[in-house]
């Protein structure tokens, strides 16, 4: 019998789905319940019923599961950024291990016992205030005061969040102070519906090891009224290395515009990642959790098993940090990235490290186009590292990888589902999946990364 909307029942949550919803079974149908924890006994109301499954909401928790804890953030539910703050961190790690295992078993069709699968790699003492970058939308609260926060799920309604647990305390304090200065100067937040108002976002970045700090106002116009005083005040009060203005006048939800100018300081901050020196403005992609990223990079280097005479190809390389962190262990590195600023940054870092182009070079190209060209030219890298976006590798990239026939392929993925899909294709083309290592780069959120090691079967 099919479940009906508004039907109420009592049930026990068995586990979590890949989007961190609780999963229960009622009358033979799966019911997905946001905010539930494994082992919870709940009274659940069906909010949407489909043919073979349904979605529910918790009306009451009759008995909490062993991993449920009281959230330490008052707005984590409407904000939605911390989808797992109602779980103990140990339970969260178990769940994330399960997310990755399920992706490879169900979507990839793998027998998980056929390769080395490890529990999630996590820094248990580094689960709060870990973000080195935040982009906060600016708006008005119910009383008309200027606030920052995060968008409620599937909306552009700002949930005020003056004390986010994921970002450093100075970023929270600066956001509060900036809102007060904007309000005192009569500077209105941008209104998406009317296209009026001035300030769209506050963008902050921190060099985790260097301690350098960046602030950027994203504005609907050329600048801010009383700009010099506002920027100087914030620079002095929060020891900012640099302050910038980004101009974005487009009627769009894209955060950054193309034009950025420096108000104070050098316009960039410096840091290191896995020993690689980095310069960052606002456009460069950079891992937001530095210590956890260094853990991930170490695992990727371990999986690469580089030899001194190897040619390493780094696809979707960003600012080149993964490949450059491995360069001391190989002869030649080639990186490919589609974002021009990232490629220029990678070349600058390579030059700073004293690496000539014949040892480390970077190309601004689509990964698929570059891989196809290299394959057609007869390139045979010994090791290929890929770090694709959430959509995974495209067919051109995967086909070219097979043609180039690297001894080892290391895949770093922010989406276990597409990683499993791509690994399945590669296994059908002569590769063996050797190892899968989940890594928690985003504690208290639903996201989990993984690192794969694949080898060519002829070896």
Model regions: which residues?
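Rossmann-like S-adenosyl-L-methionine
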Residues: 2-10, 18, 222-237, 241-459
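Terminal RNA-binding accessory module
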Residues: 1-75, 111
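Short, acidic/hydrophobic/Gly-rich beta-strand patch recurrent on exposed beta strands
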Residues: 22-27, 149-152, 216-218, 346
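Extended interfacial segments that mediate partner engagement and assembly in macromolecular machines
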Residues: 59-70, 77-189, 209, 224
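Carbohydrate-binding surface patches
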Residues: 203-207, 212-223
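Short beta-strand micro-motifs enriched in acidic
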Residues: 36, 45-49, 137-141, 205-209, ...
